[in-house]
Amino acid sequence: MASQGTKRSYEQMETGGERQNATEIRASVGRMVSGIGRFYIQMCTELKLSDYEGRLIQNSITIERMVLSAFDERRNRYLEEHPSAGKDPKKTGGPIYRRRDGKWVRELILYDKEEIRRIWRQANNGEDATAGLTHLMIWHSNLNDATYQRTRALVRTGMDPRMCSLMQGSTLPRRSGAAGAAIKGVGTMVMELIRMIKRGINDRNFWRGENGRRTRIAYERMCNILKGKFQTAAQRAMMDQVRESRNPGNAEIEDLIFLARSALILRGSVAHKSCLPACVYGLAVASGYDFEREGYSLVGIDPFRLLQNSQVFSLIRPNENPAHKSQLVWMACHSAAFEDLRVSSFIRGTRVVPRGQLSTRGVQIASNENMEAMDSNTLELRSRYWAIRTRSGGNTNQQRASAGQISVQPTFSVQRNLPFERATIMAAFTGNTEGRTSDMRTEIIRMMESARPEDVSFQGRGVFELSDEKATNPIVPSFDMNNEGSYFFGDNAEEYDN
């Protein structure tokens, strides 16, 4: 872990920059999102989309996926070497929805990847603009986090499905760089490491030879990223043990699962960024807004401001509730899938309900769904207040929570107590305290037991009026202390399937 002095802020990671001051960071993040906006406008022109069609979130997602696919070098190389039936490795595409005679129709489009890369580079002053691509990946990841529950993935790696609050960023592609690593939850990192260890157990040659050396370096790097997320010395010491293991196996998997559980109370630092769909940046650029001159931040008021003045539409299936669809997208935009619903509701200004009570499926429409009865509605993405996104897990103390999700991972830096259900979590910690990590385990369990439910996190931090862009008057909300609020509570959300 780099020492405190060399930590880069998210915006620096986001823009691949070295150390910059606040103004330079705002300018480079502004440059990044205006590049996305210019690209989107150009794609709408190419596809001859009307203004309304260009504001359709499903069209935005298709266009975003096309550019991500065009720049996915590893997959492109793989497709060239393993030609599969009916897949042209040089082309990319997806469904574009158009309004015809009062109905929505789906049209499948196909483009040369080379052409998409050219348009993207042209919109980004001739550069590859990797930061912008990562930004789109994070928006897709945040949307997945709000839409799906990763129960099956958790169970497959031997973790408890109720640990879903640790799974932020679990669908991020491997190539998402430092900005991607910053937003990954503790559970996501643990899952990646367990998968790796399991491969090593099953495949004798996994850690051997030239390839094995590279694998080992990747393993240690992932261990260090996870170590950097923990805030207590004992958790970090355990990570050192896992990293230094000569031949990672079941003992390491046990340690990692132990650490993941401990993170429900001794929460890790996980970054949160408001990444918006490309069409939102496109709308702003088209209306003459100069992101680079004005500067932009993913963790301050700017995304809230942008959403206050953007009209985005979504296709709605016959029995879906448009207000619920809006909530889903609002949560995705602010990376708030694992935030306490009490906090989200206060900021949004309307009640944010648990996933199981939403009458809506995912945003994307499957290719076999019937378009006949599809309608479209405006998404309500505005908020009553804004708050600063956090990169810490809040201080480590908790309270009772629900059956579906037994902890939260805060998104907004706002004073509250952090709900968790001690009995449920501590029940998992009986027994195994022997072995080489016994003293650390004992220490971690002791810290967890002394965490007090009522303790307040983010002391004195509040939300701000949308007119208060300099964050001068914090409004500290008061919450009902006994009323926990986790989103995946007792839930039946769909599974995420690749």
Curated annotation (Swiss-Prot):
Q: Which GO terms describe its cellular component?
A: helical viral capsid; host cell; host cell nucleus; ribonucleoprotein complex; viral nucleocapsid
This one is known as Nucleoprotein
User: What stretch of residues is annotated with the motif Unconventional nuclear localization signal?
Assistant: 1-18
Motif mapping: Bipartite nuclear localization signal:
198-216
* Task of the protein: Encapsidates the negative strand viral RNA, protecting it from nucleases. The encapsidated genomic RNA is termed the ribonucleoprotein (RNP) and serves as template for transcription and replication. The RNP needs to be localized in the host nucleus to start an infectious cycle, but is too large to diffuse through the nuclear pore complex. NP comprises at least 2 nuclear localization signals that are responsible for the active RNP import into the nucleus through cellular importin alpha/beta pathway.
Organism encoding this protein: Influenza A virus (strain A/Chicken/Hong Kong/31.2/2002 H5N1 genotype X1)
Q: Which domain of life is it from?
A: Viruses
User: How does it get modified post-translation?
Assistant: Late in virus-infected cells, may be cleaved from a 56-kDa protein to a 53-kDa protein by a cellular caspase. This cleavage might be a marker for the onset of apoptosis in infected cells or have a specific function in virus host interaction.
Family from the record: Belongs to the influenza viruses nucleoprotein family.
**Localization:** Virion; Host nucleus
Q: Which gene encodes it?
A: NP
What Pfam families does the entry give? Answer: Flu_NP
Query: Quaternary arrangement and interactors, per the entry?
Result: Homomultimerizes to form the nucleocapsid. May bind host exportin-1/XPO1. Binds to viral genomic RNA. Protein-RNA contacts are mediated by a combination of electrostatic interactions between positively charged residues and the phosphate backbone and planar interactions between aromatic side chains and bases.
Q: What is its main location?
A: virion
Q: Which GO terms describe its biological process?
A: symbiont entry into host cell; viral penetration into host nucleus
Q: Give one GO term, molecular function aspect.
A: structural molecule activity
Question: Keywords for this entry?
Answer: Capsid protein, Helical capsid protein, Host nucleus, Host-virus interaction, Ribonucleoprotein, RNA-binding, Viral nucleoprotein, Viral penetration into host nucleus, Virion, Virus entry into host cell
**SUPFAM superfamilies per record:** flu NP-like (SSF161003)
Region Disordered, annotated ranges: 1-21
